[in-house]
Amino acid sequence: MAETPRPAEHTSSLKIYFRLLSYVKPYVGIFLLSIVGFVIFASTQPMLAGILKYFVDGLSNPEAVLFPNVPYLRDLQLLQAVPLLIILIAAWQGLGSFLGNYFLAKVSLSLVHDLRVALFNKLLVLPNRYFDNHNSGHLISRITFNVTMVTGAATDAIKVVIREGLTVVFLFAYLLWMNWHLTLVMVAILPVIAVMVSIASKKFRKQSKKIQVAMGDVTHVASETIQGYRVVRSFGGEAYEQQRFGQASQSNTDKQLRMTKTGSLYTPMLQLVIYSAMAALMFLVLFLRGDSTAGDLVAYITAAGLLPKPIRQLSEVSSTIQKGLAGAESIFEQLDEAPEVDTGTVEKERVEGRLEVRNLSFTYPGTEREVLSDISFVAEPGQMIALVGRSGSGKSTLAALIPRFYHHDKGQILLDGVEIEHYRLRNLRRHVSQVTQHVTLFNDTVANNIAYGDLAGAPRADIEAAAADAYAKEFVDRLPKGFDTEVGENGVLLSGGQRQRLAIARALLKNAPLLILDEATSALDTESERHIQAALDHVMQGRTTLVIAHRLSTIEKADQILVMDQGRLVERGTHTELLAANGHYARLHAMGLDEPAKADIT
């Protein structure tokens, strides 16, 4: 492969890293305090080497004084001074260690929190197409796994760079002060170390990206299996899911091992280089000892012996940084995604509910086939419009365009005479309620599931009234804690009919003038279907309703039926008119339109 992109890659890495460090700005005071702690810690390393000089010299003359020219200390002999200094150095080092480790941990944990919140908040404003193109496992993995790796680069790596870097600087300064000629031998190995670090960094970065993708796959498979555990058990999919998860986990393990192998080879090679330089240095110290005292030689060798550990840790930090940079790339990629387009300025307290669609066409982003083509119709306030057609005819897509989950390419959608693009997005969605066949409930109480989002804080009386109108209160009152009963993840503790009635109660409490209804009840028992039909009749009263219709009983009551086929409106009229026309609708009716499983109208 050509190596020309390297400078750009280097610049990109620096750009990502500096952007990552920008998240530390709110904690700069705490961060500086941690740096002070690491400076204190690093300063003790040459002190420990220096104290050995006085200890060795004191063996031959314990009554010698340590500070002959300092008032009040000129009588302090080595016998008392050396033990006292060791205790003071240890206390000084402990203070530095506490300040550095505690306050950097505080910065690190705050950074984890900030990045996770930023990622989660971004998810809430991203357009639908983003979720269409990214599986949930990878999105969750970014918030959990990737963020942890990133904070390692932003804080843990800095800890090593500052603490061990300053240790190396202080030790080198001490060695130069003692014998600068010999110290140049140690300096000679630095270019070799730099080359090794550069080569290893590229490998770590590449392998880290692969590990993150593999970890996302593990999360995705586990998430899918847990969410669909009933289907897995019903269709005997245990063996298949075990195999799928095992393959994803094994792939992640293999990639982790490759990175470990790289690090395991890199560290001993680096140590060999460092200790070879140490061997040469010791030979020269013994060969060229000159007029140095035994204490001088011991102090010099000790200081030189303290160098390999921080140098090795500095070189190994490259792995942490590259892992973090790989994670940061994916995080910033999500944070840089454009949010939902919201350029509208119109806000209305309440609309009448007149819906007009003019020459509407739509193509999903990244595809070429037109899903909707030249659709036009008008729904007057309070009217019910039924959308009928085979699966894939574009009914659900049309319904998704009204609350602007997607943006149409051509034509107009007007609510009370105003193009929906001109409404502020949040205001537009306040005027629209949706009840779909895929009910979403949260792991919370019945009351909080009905009064969700903007409805939170609604009076209990209003919540109970909405539940009563949705024919839900009768079963809610039988629950252990009534409206304060937890419903489990996605309402798992409730039946399908009960979940749908809570969704209808939510729509009733919202009291929006425009209702979009996917009226699927084919999976319910007769009693549940009867209750839900009564609830739906109630929720549609006085509201403009767009129904993706499945049953004949609903269609017969519609003010207008729109028959769709391959993204086009092929027929429109009332039930009687369309039967008389003997066209698409009549054929669907003959197939048993009141039987969704046969008609496959979704």
Curated annotation (Swiss-Prot):
<dbReference type="GO" id="GO:0016887">
    <property type="term" value="F:ATP hydrolysis activity"/>
</dbReference>
<keyword id="KW-0812">Transmembrane</keyword>
<feature type="domain" description="ABC transporter">
    <location>
        <begin position="355"/>
        <end position="591"/>
    </location>
</feature>
<keyword id="KW-0445">Lipid transport</keyword>
<dbReference type="GO" id="GO:0005886">
    <property type="term" value="C:plasma membrane"/>
</dbReference>
<keyword id="KW-0997">Cell inner membrane</keyword>
<dbReference type="GO" id="GO:0034040">
    <property type="term" value="F:ATPase-coupled lipid transmembrane transporter activity"/>
</dbReference>
<keyword id="KW-0472">Membrane</keyword>
<dbReference type="Pfam" id="PF00005">
    <property type="entry name" value="ABC_tran"/>
</dbReference>
<dbReference type="InterPro" id="IPR039421">
    <property type="entry name" value="Type_1_exporter"/>
</dbReference>
<feature type="transmembrane region" description="Helical">
    <location>
        <begin position="268"/>
        <end position="288"/>
    </location>
</feature>
<keyword id="KW-1003">Cell membrane</keyword>
<feature type="transmembrane region" description="Helical">
    <location>
        <begin position="84"/>
        <end position="104"/>
    </location>
</feature>
<feature type="transmembrane region" description="Helical">
    <location>
        <begin position="28"/>
        <end position="48"/>
    </location>
</feature>
<dbReference type="InterPro" id="IPR011917">
    <property type="entry name" value="ABC_transpr_lipidA"/>
</dbReference>
<keyword id="KW-0813">Transport</keyword>
<keyword id="KW-1278">Translocase</keyword>
<keyword id="KW-0067">ATP-binding</keyword>
<dbReference type="InterPro" id="IPR036640">
    <property type="entry name" value="ABC1_TM_sf"/>
</dbReference>
<comment type="subunit">
    <text>Homodimer.</text>
</comment>
<dbReference type="InterPro" id="IPR003593">
    <property type="entry name" value="AAA+_ATPase"/>
</dbReference>
<comment type="similarity">
    <text>Belongs to the ABC transporter superfamily. Lipid exporter (TC 3.A.1.106) family.</text>
</comment>
<dbReference type="Pfam" id="PF00664">
    <property type="entry name" value="ABC_membrane"/>
</dbReference>
<dbReference type="GO" id="GO:0015421">
    <property type="term" value="F:ABC-type oligopeptide transporter activity"/>
</dbReference>
<feature type="transmembrane region" description="Helical">
    <location>
        <begin position="180"/>
        <end position="200"/>
    </location>
</feature>
<dbReference type="InterPro" id="IPR003439">
    <property type="entry name" value="ABC_transporter-like_ATP-bd"/>
</dbReference>
<feature type="domain" description="ABC transmembrane type-1">
    <location>
        <begin position="32"/>
        <end position="323"/>
    </location>
</feature>
<dbReference type="InterPro" id="IPR011527">
    <property type="entry name" value="ABC1_TM_dom"/>
</dbReference>
<feature type="transmembrane region" description="Helical">
    <location>
        <begin position="158"/>
        <end position="178"/>
    </location>
</feature>
<keyword id="KW-1133">Transmembrane helix</keyword>
<dbReference type="InterPro" id="IPR017871">
    <property type="entry name" value="ABC_transporter-like_CS"/>
</dbReference>
<protein>
    <recommendedName>
        <fullName>ATP-dependent lipid A-core flippase</fullName>
        <ecNumber>7.5.2.6</ecNumber>
    </recommendedName>
</protein>
<feature type="binding site">
    <location>
        <begin position="389"/>
        <end position="396"/>
    </location>
    <ligand>
        <name>ATP</name>
    </ligand>
</feature>
<dbReference type="GO" id="GO:0005524">
    <property type="term" value="F:ATP binding"/>
</dbReference>
<comment type="function">
    <text>Involved in lipopolysaccharide (LPS) biosynthesis. Translocates lipid A-core from the inner to the outer leaflet of the inner membrane. Transmembrane domains (TMD) form a pore in the inner membrane and the ATP-binding domain (NBD) is responsible for energy generation.</text>
</comment>
<keyword id="KW-0547">Nucleotide-binding</keyword>
<dbReference type="InterPro" id="IPR027417">
    <property type="entry name" value="P-loop_NTPase"/>
</dbReference>
